[in-house]
UniProtKB/Swiss-Prot annotation:
It comes from Acinonyx jubatus. One of its GO terms (cellular component) is extracellular vesicle. Residues 1-18 form the signal peptide. Homodimer. Interacts with APOA1BP and CLU. Component of a sperm activating protein complex (SPAP), consisting of APOA1, an immunoglobulin heavy chain, an immunoglobulin light chain and albumin. Interacts with NDRG1. Interacts with SCGB3A2. Interacts with NAXE and YJEFN3. Residues 67-266 are annotated as: 10 X approximate tandem repeats. Its main location: secreted. It is found in: Secreted. GO terms for molecular function: cholesterol transfer activity; phosphatidylcholine-sterol O-acyltransferase activator activity; phospholipid binding; protein homodimerization activity. This is Apolipoprotein A-I. InterPro entries: ApoA_E, Apolipoprotein_A1/A4/E. Glycosylated. Sequence repeats lie at residues 67-88, 89-110, 111-121, 122-143, 144-165, 166-187, 188-209, 210-231, 232-242, 243-266. One of its GO terms (biological process) is positive regulation of phospholipid efflux. The modification Methionine sulfoxide is found at residue 109.
């Protein structure tokens, strides 16, 4: 039952045409990778659940109950597969439409990010260069102290610590200075990127084409369609579960009745 619940929880994210993600020859979109991962997980849960059912039926309690769960499990698996096939095209259409309708915005934001990246890259390179120089300078100052320690006695450890502490503090202070300088240099570009994003979203709201409100309306429409498409398939799944639950109930009641009779006879 746990496997069934897990399967239902994720089958809405996957389509019927998904393939294993490690078998792809062509580059995949993010949606395809997510769907393939979910499909692999669902298959693993389904196979693992069938193994547990088989082990239970082989046990003494399973033989006594005689629920024939394995037959019902295979039937249930077919029902779940059918459900995925029915809902798969609807979810695929939803993701395709969402990706298509936000393509322009994503392209514009990628362009903005690339422009800002090119502007700040010199500052990042300069920061990295200065940091490497500071580390090298620190290493040069510390190296003689290490030699002194190897050549000296144990009592010089305290002296070494006293000499290293100022050097460590100096490195920390110089690094903090460089970080503060970098932060000040990048601040205008961070503000610029934030303003660009705000402008893109504002233009999207005011445009005569696809707006954020339209995205929300279309998403709601697709989700409503998905819900309507899923109702018959979910009802089929519920009907497939009924024999399993009824068989379990009958078998359990038989065991309870038998145990009650034995207790009364004693």
């Amino acid at each position: 039952m746990k496997a069934v619940v897990l399967t239902l929880a994720v089958l809405f994210l996957t389509g019927s045409q998904a393939r294993h993600f490690w078998q792809q020859d062509d580059p995949q979109s993010p949606w395809d990778r997510v769907k393939d991962l979910v499909t692999v997980y669902v298959d693993a849960v389904k196979d693992g659940g069938r193994e547990y059912v088989a082990q239970f039926e082989a046990s003494a309690l399973g033989k006594q109950l005689n629920l024939k769960l394995l037959d019902n499990w295979d039937t249930l698996g077919s029902t779940v597969t059918k459900l995925r096939e029915q809902i798969g095209p609807v979810t695929q259409e939803f993701w395709d439409n969402l990706e298509k309708e936000t393509e322009v915005l994503r392209q514009e934001m990628s362009k903005d990010l690339e422009e800002v990246k090119q502007k700040v890259q010199p500052y990042l390179d300069d920061f990295q260069k200065k940091w490497q120089e500071e580390v090298e300078l620190y290493r040069q100052k510390v190296a003689p102290l290490g030699t002194e320690l190897r050549e000296g006695a144990r009592q010089k450890l305290q002296e070494l610590h006293e000499k290293l502490s100022p050097l460590g503090e100096e490195l920390r202070d110089r690094a903090r200075t460089h970080v503060d300088a970098l932060r000040a240099q990048l601040a205008p570009y961070s503000d610029e990127l934030r303003e660009r994003l705000a402008a893109r979203l504002q233009a999207l709201k005011e445009s005569g084409g696809a707006s954020l409100a339209e995205y929300h309306a279309k998403a709601s429409e697709h989700l409503s369609t998905l819900s309507e498409k899923a109702k018959p398939a979910l009802e089929d799944l519920r009907q497939g579960l009924l024999p399993v639950l009824e068989s379990f109930k009958v078998g359990l009641m038989a065991i309870v009745d038998e145990a009650t009779k034995k207790l009364n006879a004693q």
